[in-house]
C-alpha cells in the first residue's frame, strides 16, 4: 500500500515537472529558436544514422551544415529585437549575446567542411564526430545567453565534455589519449574552482543566482567589498582562465593541440575562445561591477604574460600545431585588452571585430594543416618546405592567413589589431598596448619564417614529404578549398572596409 502511494506521488511529480517544462518551451521557445534548430538537427542525425548505411555519409555533412546555416539565419532575422529575459530569468536574449552566438555558429559552419578529408582518411566515425560538434556548439550558444550561475556552469560543461570526447576521438593514437587525459583533468579542476567562486558569490549576495540580482544582493548585504568577493573573483578568474588559456593557465593547450585530431583542434582553437570571452564579459562586467579595478589588474597580468610567453615560445617550436597553440595564447592576450576596456571606448566592439578576423585567419591556417597532414603524415614545420611548387593555391592562401595573423597591412588582422590597440590606448592602457605592439612584431618573425619555407623551401630544396604530396579526391578537396576561400576573403577584404563591421559590433552593447 505504501509503495503504491509513493508510486502515484512519483508519477504526479513527474507529470508536473514535464508539464512545467512543456509550458516553458511552448511560451519561451521562440527565444531559443536558433538553438532549437540545432537540437532538431541532432535528432535528425541520430535517426538517419540508426536507419542508414555508409552510402548516406554525405547526408550527415549536409544535415549538420544546413542546421548551422539555418540557425545563423534565424539569428540574423532576430537582429535588433528588444532584449528579453526568458525561462524564469535563466536566459537572456540581446544583440550582445547574439553576436557571440553568431561567431560560434560561424566557427562550426567553417569547421565541418575542413573535417571531410580528415574523417575519410582516418575512417573516423562521422556521426559521433558531427554530434559532438553540434552539441558543443549548442552548449556555447546557451553559455552566451546564460543569465544565472547554474546555467553559466552547465552550459560550458556541455561544451567541455564534448571537447574532451573530440580530443580523444582517435583512441589508437597515444598522443591523443595523453592530450585527452590532460585536458580532462585540467578541465575538471578548473570547473571545480569556478564553482567554488560561484558559491562565494552566491553566499555573499544573500542567495541570489541571477547576475543582476547578485549585484542588487551585494548592495543590500553591503558585501561588495568583502573578502568573500575577493575570493570569488580569484576563483572565477582562475576558472575562466583555463577556458581562455592565457598564460599561466595554458599548460594544457600545446599538448591538446598536438595530440588531438587536426579538425578538432581547428574547432576548439576558435569556439572555446569565443565562448570563454562571452563568459568573461558577462561575469566580470555585471557581478563584479564594484571590483572593476581588481579584475582589471588581474586581466592585465594575464594579458602581459600571454603576449610575451606565447609569442616568444612560439618561435622555438618545430611542430606546426604546437606553434599555433602558442600563437593562440599570444592572440588571447590581445583579446583580453578589449575585455579590460569594456563597453567604454569601443573595447567590446574592437574585441568582437578582432575575434571575427581571428576566426578566419586561424581556420585558414588550419586548413593547410588538414590538407597537408593526412597526405604526408607529418606536422613538422620544416617538412612544409617548397609546398608552393606542388599546391600554389594552398601555399598562397596559407601565406595570406599567416600574414593577417601577424598584422601585416592592408590585411584584416592589421586593422583589427590597430583598432584594438587604439581603444586600449584611449583607455589609458599604455603599457599593455606597448607590450602588444612589441609582441606583434615578434609574431611576424615566425609567421614569415613559415611563409619563406612554403614559397622557397629550406636551402631552396623540396622535402620528400612535399615531393610525394598528392592532391586529394575531388569532393573532399573542394570542401577544404571552399572553407579556405571563405577564410582568405575574410582575412583580407574586410580590413579595407572596417567601419561597417565596427558599427555592427557597436550596436550590440547590452
UniProtKB/Swiss-Prot annotation:
The keyword Translocase applies. One of its GO terms (biological process) is photosynthesis, light reaction. The chain crosses the membrane at residues 24-44, 59-79, 99-119, 124-144, 149-169, 183-203, 229-249, 295-315, 323-343, 347-367, 395-415, 418-438, 484-504. Keywords: Chloroplast, Membrane, NAD, NADP, Plastid, Plastoquinone, Quinone, Thylakoid, Translocase, Transmembrane, Transmembrane helix, Transport. Belongs to the complex I subunit 2 family. NDH is composed of at least 16 different subunits, 5 of which are encoded in the nucleus. This is NAD(P)H-quinone oxidoreductase subunit 2 A, chloroplastic. It comes from Amborella trichopoda. The lineage of its organism: Eukaryota, Viridiplantae, Streptophyta, Embryophyta, Tracheophyta.
Amino acid at each position: 500500500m505504501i509503495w503504491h502511494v509513493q508510486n502515484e506521488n512519483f508519477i504526479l511529480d513527474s507529470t508536473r515537472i514535464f508539464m512545467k517544462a512543456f509550458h516553458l518551451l511552448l511560451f519561451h521557445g521562440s527565444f531559443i529558436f536558433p538553438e532549437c534548430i540545432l537540437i532538431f538537427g541532432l535528432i535528425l542525425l541520430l535517426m538517419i544514422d540508426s536507419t542508414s548505411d555508409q552510402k548516406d555519409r554525405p547526408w550527415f555533412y549536409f544535415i549538420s551544415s544546413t542546421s548551422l546555416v539555418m540557425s545563423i539565419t534565424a539569428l540574423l532575422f532576430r537582429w535588433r529585437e528588444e532584449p528579453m529575459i526568458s525561462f524564469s530569468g535563466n536566459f537572456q536574449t540581446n544583440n550582445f549575446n547574439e553576436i557571440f552566438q553568431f561567431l560560434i555558429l560561424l566557427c562550426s559552419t567553417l569547421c565541418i567542411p575542413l573535417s571531410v578529408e580528415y574523417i575519410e582518411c582516418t575512417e573516423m566515425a562521422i556521426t559521433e564526430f558531427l554530434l559532438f560538434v553540434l552539441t558543443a556548439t549548442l552548449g556555447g550558444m546557451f553559455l552566451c545567453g546564460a543569465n544565472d550561475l547554474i546555467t553559466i556552469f552547465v552550459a560550458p560543461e556541455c561544451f567541455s565534455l564534448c571537447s574532451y570526447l573530440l580530443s580523444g576521438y582517435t583512441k589508437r593514437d597515444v598522443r591523443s589519449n595523453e592530450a585527452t587525459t590532460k585536458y580532462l583533468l585540467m578541465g575538471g579542476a578548473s570547473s571545480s574552482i569556478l564553482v567554488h567562486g560561484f558559491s562565494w558569490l552566491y553566499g555573499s549576495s544573500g542567495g541570489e543566482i541571477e547576475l543582476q540580482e547578485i549585484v542588487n544582493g551585494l548592495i543590500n548585504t553591503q558585501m561588495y567589498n568583502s573578502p568573500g568577493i575577493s575570493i570569488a573573483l580569484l576563483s572565477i578568474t582562475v576558472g575562466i582562465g583555463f577556458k581562455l588559456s592565457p598564460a599561466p593557465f595554458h599548460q594544457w593547450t600545446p599538448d591538446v593541440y598536438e595530440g588531438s585530431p587536426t579538425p578538432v583542434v581547428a574547432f576548439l582553437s576558435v569556439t572555446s575562445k569565443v565562448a570563454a570571452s562571452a563568459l568573461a564579459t558577462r561575469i566580470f562586467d555585471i557581478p563584479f561591477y564594484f571590483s572593476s579595478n581588481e579584475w582589471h589588474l588581474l586581466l592585465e597580468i594575464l594579458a602581459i604574460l600571454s603576449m610575451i610567453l606565447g609569442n616568444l615560445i612560439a618561435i622555438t617550436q618545430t611542430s606546426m600545431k604546437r606553434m599555433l597553440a602558442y600563437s593562440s595564447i599570444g592572440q588571447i592576450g590581445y583579446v583580453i585588452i578589449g575585455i579590460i576596456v569594456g563597453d567604454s571606448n569601443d573595447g567590446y566592439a574592437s574585441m568582437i571585430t578582432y575575434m571575427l578576423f581571428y576566426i578566419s585567419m586561424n581556420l585558414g591556417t588550419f586548413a593547410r594543416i588538414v590538407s597537408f597532414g593526412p597526405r604526408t603524415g607529418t606536422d613538422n614545420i620544416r617538412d612544409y618546405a617548397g609546398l608552393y611548387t606542388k599546391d600554389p593555391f594552398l601555399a598562397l592562401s596559407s601565406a595570406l592567413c599567416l600574414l593577417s595573423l601577424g598584422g601585416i597591412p592592408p590585411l584584416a588582422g592589421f586593422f583589427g589589431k590597430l583598432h584594438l590597440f587604439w581603444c586600449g590606448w584611449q583607455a589609458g592602457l599604455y603599457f599593455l598596448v606597448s607590450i602588444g605592439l612589441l609582441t606583434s612584431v615578434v609574431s611576424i618573425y615566425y609567421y614569415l619564417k613559415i611563409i619563406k619555407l612554403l614559397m622557397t623551401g629550406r636551402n631552396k630544396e623540396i622535402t620528400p614529404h612535399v615531393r610525394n604530396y598528392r592532391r586529394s579526391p575531388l569532393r573532399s578537396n573542394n570542401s577544404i578549398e571552399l572553407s579556405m576561400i571563405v577564410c582568405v576573403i575574410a582575412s583580407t577584404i574586410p580590413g579595407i572596409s572596417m567601419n561597417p563591421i565596427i558599427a555592427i559590433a557597436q550596436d550590440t552593447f547590452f
